[in-house]
């Protein structure tokens, strides 16, 4: 089979193919995980990843252009676009960042965001440039850009070199959006797993709001890589909040 020539017709054929392979149970599962997302076909991520890998070997730029212009609103379309970008090999880092920047400006789902972040393996070969890009997005008023940055820090920068910076970011970059706060809590739970003593010290003197702080402790306690003793200590560290 030759390379697909992407146009409105071939893109619609892709959507029909996805619908023909829909899993209703998985669709219901995905609906529950993504409040506000009604248009879901029901395709598992490994299958979407296979599609994206095939597309990225061809004219992926044309595919992205056509897919944006002919978007049907399905979450699977967002997943595929993100995974295609994550798979590209034949572009320089600045062009890559342009595509990433455009994509994250359209994100409105935590699952799309987090799957996208995990696919950006090119980050490992461009740590400094991507680090700058991540910090730039933390300045945005868009909470999804901030979540992108937090998850990227967790996926690629969770090391001794960046730990103090991560703590500082969690203390100083604020946003009332639920999915941003939950990303910060998740990041800090992973910090605890890798750097127990320094993260414990951070928890005792941090500047987190009560919700994010308590969620960070909760997510840390839920980890299978945290000892029973530490879970008890963390339980006692929970802040008591007054319900209004």
List the model feature ranges, each with a label.
Residues 1-244:
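Alpha-helical scaffold domains
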């Amino acid at each position: 089979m030759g390379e697909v020539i992407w146009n409105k017709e071939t893109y619609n054929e892709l959507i029909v193919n996805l619908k023909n392979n829909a899993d209703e149970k998985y669709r219901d599962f995905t609906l529950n995980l993504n409040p506000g997302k009604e248009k879901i076909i029901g395709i598992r991520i490994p299958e979407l990843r296979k599609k994206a890998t095939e597309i990225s070997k061809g004219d992926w730029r044309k595919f992205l252009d056509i897919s944006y212009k002919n978007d049907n609103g399905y979450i699977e379309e967002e997943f595929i676009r993100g995974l295609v970008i994550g798979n590209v090999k034949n572009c320089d880092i600045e062009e890559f960042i342009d595509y990433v920047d455009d994509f994250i400006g359209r994100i409105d789902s935590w699952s799309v965001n987090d799957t996208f972040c995990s696919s950006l393996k090119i980050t490992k070969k461009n740590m400094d440039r991507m680090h700058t890009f991540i910090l730039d997005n933390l300045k945005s008023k868009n909470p999804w850009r901030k979540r992108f940055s937090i998850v990227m820090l967790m996926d690629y920068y969770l090391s001794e070199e960046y730990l103090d910076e991560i703590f500082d970011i969690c203390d100083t970059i604020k946003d009332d959006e639920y999915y941003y706060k939950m990303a910060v809590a998740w990041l800090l739970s992973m910090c605890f797993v890798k750097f127990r003593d320094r993260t414990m010290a951070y928890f005792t003197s941090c500047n987190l709001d009560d919700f994010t702080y308590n969620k960070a402790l909760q997510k840390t306690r839920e980890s299978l890589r945290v000892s029973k003793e530490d879970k008890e200590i963390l339980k006692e560290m929970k802040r008591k909040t007054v319900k209004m």
